[in-house]
């Protein structure tokens, strides 16, 4: 059995890791780190896991408690994973970090957007960006995987094939993305109080969202040239899910059948990417609770536009599910093990 530890187990992404790994036939969870709930039974923190997860939360000693594990999941806020990652890697063990600390390859860009000094530059140089469908070989060989953010996952999977095949303009990409409230995390926040987010939709962080450099980094790699995008996220009154509507210009006047063929070339063998055909478009309910990313598109001949829509569950494919998928790949397992949950409908 694979012995796994989870740092930050009581945040939403950490709790989703606990749920998925508890159901994984090849994994035993060795510890559930939580400073906020130290000594408290995990089922008291998350009643949904009563009689399923029987361990207690504990504040982990970074010096001693890593000895008995094979792989570490860090589900801590940005800036807090770096010391744990350094210590774990020094022991020759493997790490999947769900924070932003190792996603952005240029530390100066990371420091400018996150206002945190990067103190694990050696480890940053060894990190592999964990977009499972795009970098499978690199992930298999990695000691450290930087798990992608939720918005970047939904956007990069949608655009990667089109940019690689040079069928859309790189100059005028506009992304309108909508996220459920769990994307804001579990900490108390005035903006996510029920009475303020229920029956309410609002845009936020226009042009300043911290996922922008991560998105631009990955799209630039796909396009083979530096890209700048216009990204506007919105908070919508649902628990989980991300719907990204992406406006691009169809520079080669590619027809819908050809676009379907492009997506099929990249994703036909990818279990967790589902291409919707015949003009059907994704919806968040159809992926809720699952590791799927649904992608659909529409060609608008009147404007020469190619509009792409993607949907993911922000806590699964956008966080914990992709982390488990990456673990499977790193450890030589079939990548879908522990991730075969069907979406919840309605």
Swiss-Prot record:
User: What is its biological role?
Assistant: Catalyzes the NADPH-dependent reduction of N-acetyl-5-glutamyl phosphate to yield N-acetyl-L-glutamate 5-semialdehyde.
Q: Where is the active site?
A: 150
Q: What is this protein called?
A: N-acetyl-gamma-glutamyl-phosphate reductase
Q: Which NCBIfam families match?
A: argC (TIGR01850)
Family annotation (InterPro entries): AGPR_AS, AGPR_type-1, NAD(P)-bd_dom_sf, NAGSA_dehydrogenase, Semialdehyde_DH_NAD-bd
Gene responsible for this protein: argC
What is the main EC category here? Answer: oxidoreductase
Source organism phylogeny: Bacteria, Bacillati, Bacillota, Clostridia, Peptostreptococcales
GO biological process terms, alphabetically, are: L-arginine biosynthetic process
Q: Does the keyword 4Fe-4S apply?
A: no
**Family per record:** Belongs to the NAGSA dehydrogenase family. Type 1 subfamily.
Give an example GO molecular function: N-acetyl-gamma-glutamyl-phosphate reductase activity
Please state where this protein is localized. Answer: Cytoplasm
Q: E.C. number, please?
A: 1.2.1.38
Listed GO cellular component terms?
A: cytoplasm
Q: Which UniProt keywords apply?
A: Amino-acid biosynthesis, Arginine biosynthesis, Cytoplasm, NADP, Oxidoreductase
What SMART domains does the record point to? Semialdhyde_dh
Source superkingdom: Bacteria
Give the record's pathway: Amino-acid biosynthesis; L-arginine biosynthesis; N(2)-acetyl-L-ornithine from L-glutamate: step 3/4
Q: Which organism is it from?
A: Alkaliphilus metalliredigens (strain QYMF)
Do you know which HAMAP family this protein is assigned to? ArgC_type1 (MF_00150)
Catalytic activity, reaction form: N-acetyl-L-glutamate 5-semialdehyde + phosphate + NADP(+) = N-acetyl-L-glutamyl 5-phosphate + NADPH + H(+)
């Amino acid at each position: 059995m694979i012995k796994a530890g989870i740092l930050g187990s009581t945040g939403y992404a950490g709790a989703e890791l606990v749920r998925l790994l508890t159901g994984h036939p090849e994994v035993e969870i060795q510890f559930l780190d939580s400073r906020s709930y130290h000594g408290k039974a995990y089922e008291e923190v998350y009643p949904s896991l009563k009689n399923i997860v029987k361990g207690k939360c504990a504040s982990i000693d970074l010096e001693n408690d890593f000895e008995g594990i094979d792989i570490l999941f860090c589900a801590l806020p940005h800036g807090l994973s770096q010391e744990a990652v350094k210590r774990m890697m020094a022991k020759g063990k493997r790490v999947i970090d769900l924070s932003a600390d190792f996603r952005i390859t240029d530390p100066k860009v990371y420091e400018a957007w996150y206002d945190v000094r990067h103190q694990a530059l050696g480890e940053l140089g060894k990190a592999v960006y964990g977009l499972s469908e795009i970098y499978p070989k690199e992930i298999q060989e990695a000691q450290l995987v930087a798990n992608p953010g939720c918005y970047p996952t939904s956007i990069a999977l949608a655009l990667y094939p089109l940019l690689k095949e040079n069928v859309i303009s790189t100059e005028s990409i506009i992304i309108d993305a909508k996220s459920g409230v769990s994307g804001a995390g579990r900490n108390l926040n005035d903006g996510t109080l029920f009475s303020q987010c229920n029956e309410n939709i609002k845009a936020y962080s226009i042009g300043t969202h911290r996922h922008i450099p991560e998105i631009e980094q990955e799209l630039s790699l796909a396009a083979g040239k530096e890209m700048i995008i216009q990204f506007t996220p919105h908070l919508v009154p649902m628990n989980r899910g991300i719907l990204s509507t992406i406006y691009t210009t169809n520079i080669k006047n590619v027809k819908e059948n050809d676009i379907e063929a492009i997506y099929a070339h990249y994703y036909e063998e990818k279990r967790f990417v589902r291409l919707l055909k015949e003009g059907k478009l994704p919806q968040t309910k159809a992926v809720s609770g699952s590791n799927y990313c649904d992608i659909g598109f529409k060609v608008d001949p009147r404007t020469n536009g190619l509009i792409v829509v993607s949907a993911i569950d922000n806590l699964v494919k956008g966080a914990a599910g992709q982390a488990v998928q990456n673990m499977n790949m790193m450890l030589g397992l079939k990548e879908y093990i522990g991730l075969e949950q069907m979406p919840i409908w309605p």
